[in-house]
């Protein structure tokens, strides 16, 4: 599918500023890729989480990070809590068509003043009879301009910030939902990213996922799958960047010999290849622990942190060896340089990952 339905069109989609999510997700849905780890009763394959990781790792062969990221939202970011905690009615209405690719999903968590600090979100869903009335806004929403529904995190109460939030399935065509703008980004050019505003948006309370006030907890669980997806999606991409750099530096001659013959280059590429393989081993261990029902927060956090670091280190080192050609948009290494920078920011910044790890290690200073 990647060679036939995606890679031939990526350059065109990059220029257009988005990939056709509905058309592509429908093809993925027909192939059974969007619900590999989701319940059979709602159109999924009922397999374990490792199969979602196989999908993610395979998508690393796409010529850019946009399609893997948008697909990751559909599989491992906007739907895990719905699949696990949603009512059968909600799962029929939102999960089933997301698995078939008839619906495009997005995740509404981040806000202008609350990115990694999820507890500080300001969007509210006020109780009004059998409905919630939603006001506020969300920022940096992947798939936001094309989505049919949003898995929205909003404040539904006045209590402590970790116990006053709920996840709500919000149809994007509901009155009062407004896409303010499509955001212009450094990288991930064919992944549409939106700023979205909510003005007196009314949705029935039956659209809430699970219990009221449990949204923060549910979202933290979704973050684990999101972070593991991000790790898996970068592996083959990094390997491809390294392999293409080997090919280029072997063919490119300077001062009478191939660039690759310089020890500083072939040693560095060997180091980077080792780093990728070590990250893969960490991912596979975390995946096994997750399947066995264990808390993978430390392992997923370590993986996300390392993936973010390598997302800067590998494209930067490889681009340097491409020299002037690496600075040209026509080379894939320049796209990797732009796209992979996001891994250190999205889904929890590196600094937040370090804080999480320090908390588990008992080294975080008391507040």
Residue ranges and their predicted role:
Residues 76-85:
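Helix-loop "lid/cap" segments that line or gate small-molecule binding pockets
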């Amino acid at each position: 599918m990647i060679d036939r339905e995606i890679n031939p069109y990526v350059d065109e989609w990059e220029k257009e500023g988005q990939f056709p999510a509905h058309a592509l997700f429908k093809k993925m849905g027909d192939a059974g890729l969007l619900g590999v780890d989701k319940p059979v009763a709602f159109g999924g394959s009922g397999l374990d989480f490792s199969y979602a990781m196989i999908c993610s790792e395979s998508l690393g062969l796409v010529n850019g990070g946009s399609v893997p990221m948008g697909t990751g939202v559909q599989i491992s970011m906007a739907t895990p809590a719905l699949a696990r905690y949603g009512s059968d009615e909600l799962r029929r209405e939102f999960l089933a068509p997301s698995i078939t690719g008839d619906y495009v999903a997005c995740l509404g968590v981040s806000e202008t003043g609350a990115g990694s600090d999820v507890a500080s979100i300001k969007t509210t869903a006020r109780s009004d009879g059998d409905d919630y009335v939603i006001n506020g806004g969300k920022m940096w929403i992947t798939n936001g301009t094309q989505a049919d529904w949003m898995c929205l995190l909003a404040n539904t109460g006045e209590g402590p910030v970790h116990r006053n939030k709920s996840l709500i399935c919000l149809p994007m065509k509901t009155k009062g939902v407004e896409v303010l703008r499509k955001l212009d980004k450094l990288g991930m050019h064919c992944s549409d990213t939106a700023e979205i505003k909510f003005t007196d948006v009314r949705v029935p309370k039956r659209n809430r996922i699970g219990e009221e006030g449990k949204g923060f907890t549910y979202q933290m669980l979704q973050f684990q799958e999101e972070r593991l997806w991000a790790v898996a999606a970068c592996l083959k991409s990094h390997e491809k960047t390294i392999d293409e750099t080997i090919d280029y530096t072997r063919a490119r001659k300077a001062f009478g010999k191939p660039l690759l013959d310089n020890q500083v280059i072939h040693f560095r590429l060997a180091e980077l290849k080792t780093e990728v393989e070590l990250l893969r081993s960490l991912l596979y261990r975390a995946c096994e622990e997750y399947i066995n029902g264990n808390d993978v927060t430390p392992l997923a956090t370590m993986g996300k942190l390392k993936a973010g670091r390598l997302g800067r280190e590998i494209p930067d080192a490889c681009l340097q060896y491409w020299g002037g050609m690496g600075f040209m948009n026509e080379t894939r290494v320049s796209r990797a340089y732009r796209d992979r920078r996001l891994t250190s920011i999205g889904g929890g910044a590196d600094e937040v990952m370090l804080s999480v790890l320090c908390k588990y290690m008992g080294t975080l200073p008391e507040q």
